[in-house]
Amino acid sequence: MLHILGAGSLGLLWAARLQQAGIDYRLIVRNESQLRQWNSNGNRLVFDDGAAKHTLSLAIETPDTPAPIENLIVATKAHAALAAVESLRPRLQPGAALFLLQNGLGSQQAIADAFTDCRIYCVSVTDGAWRPSEHELIWAGRGHNTVGPLRPGTAPPDWLNDLPSSISTTWQHDILPVLWRKLAVNCAINPFTLIYDCRNGEVPERAGEWLGQCIAELQQVLASHGVDANLAEQVHAVILATANNSSSTRQDLHARRRTELSYFLGYACRAAQSAGLSTPALDRLLLSAQDALR
């Protein structure tokens, strides 16, 4: 049995694909009020996978459900992750596996510190999904999941190889460099989509030389943590592949949700400061993005 915590776009995407594959799961929503909202709709989700629309009836419960949890996929926003997992502490079995799908860095270590008896895995996700309404989900970009242990030496769970082909997954024993590279790409794209209120593909033209300056500084931050990357190539490849997409950070802004800015760009700026690096372009980017959120 897999439990999914969080009924946002990513949590629903996991639930939809597990449902289609016939894998036993439960989607944990925030509270009884949210559960009643789903129940009133027959727990139905209209899932557009890019090829067809499917109407699925999801298996949903609340944190108060007493059933034990052995495998938990945490699909909340980074700032909400620790408190959300904490609400399930009485249900977590000794040695439970926690799979953390959060953007950026910082929230994963906070959970690992609070749940020392759990196996902690980090997942770098490149799927794109968004909700035109509460009970609709569009799988906008088919991506990949790279999974690895936060604590070195933790073995992969047995069921990882049993996931359906729709959940493309690989195991990476050293996950931190993967998370750092994704963080750096997010830093180079998402804040600009806030500042200019634009889609990903418009960032190079709007940002101009500022983008290149930020990439160069991010490359230094990665190097200070022993992470190799051709960051400029990766950033422009992502921009090209997601040109028509609205970044998750921009979506949060438009929906008046809290963003994860402090967990990627804020984290990168703090890491640069700790390493004694001068990053004027990134510092300016953070201030401008924060201004855009006000």
Regions found by a protein language model. Give the residues of each.
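NAD(P)+-binding Rossmann beta1-loop-alpha1 motif at the extreme N-terminus of oxidoreductases
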Residues: M1-A52
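Helix N-cap/beta->alpha junction signal
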Residues: N31, N103-G104, L265
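NAD(P)-dependent Rossmann-like dehydrogenase/reductase catalytic/cofactor-binding core
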Residues: G212, A216-R294
